[in-house]
Structures are given as structure tokens and as C-alpha cells.
């Protein structure tokens, strides 16, 4: 039978942390106060921060907004390409083309192919595709470039961004 009490009675008390030499007090840290902190510098977090600042500016409200991003820089961990529908960007920045948004390549023809087991394919007519699969007016983009651009726009509005 295991004798737990006897096992613990053998602890070398000289190895136990000396409480007089240990201070539980943490060093004082710098504090920064913001009205809004957005966690995540992806498209959604940056868009939220931008919209809040735009609304505050339009209503003459002093609102401090901060974005905290885990990556070393904005867009550093967003590696995907994207078929981007610019409707939300039109609402955020109606003049996004003049501002140099990195939306350069318009989506071309839509084609949906059914691949069968023998390796051949059959094209499905576009008229049979749901509207969500039509890419007219959309762009082929690097999401990382768009995020970096959104970060620049946010900083111009006064959003503070802390990567890393």
C-alpha cells in the first residue's frame, strides 16, 4: 500500500522557496487607455476600427481606437488569395480606387466543371449556377495586401495599431 503521508514528510525543507526573498509584487507596467480595443488586425478588425473612427469623426466625438495584432506586421499571417466582392469596401471607402486599394485584377469568366472518376470533365452552364457563384464585378486579390492597405487607411484616421 502506498504511504502518501510518509512520502511527503521527506521533503527537504531547505529547498522550499524562502518567502522572505520572494516578492509577489509585480513590476509596474505602462498602461494605455483606449475607448475601443480591437483584437485582431485582419479585414474584420480593421474595418470595425475604421468605421468607428469614421463615425466618431463625423459626429465630432473624440474616440481613441486601438488594434492589437498577433503578427509581426499587418497581413503577415494572412497568406490566401481571394475572390473579393467590393460591396463592403464601397461602404467603408467609396473612393477606394482613388486611394489606391490593391484591387487590380477583375474576375474573368465563371466556369464550373464537374470532374468524374475517369478524369474527364463536364462544363456546367452558367445559367444553372446560383448567383453566389457569379463573380461579375469581383476582384482577384492578395488578402495580405488588402489588410496592409486597410491598416494604412486606419492609421490615417488616427487608429493606433500594435503588431507583434
What name fits each language-model region?
Residues 45, 82-85, 105, 139, ...:
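Generic structural signal for well-ordered, non-membrane alpha-helical segments
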Residues 56, 158-159:
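Secondary-structure transition into beta-strands, especially the periplasmic turns and strand N-termini
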Residues 62-119:
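N-terminal FAD cofactor-binding segment of flavoenzymes
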Residues 132-156, 162:
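Short beta-strand to alpha-helix junction loop
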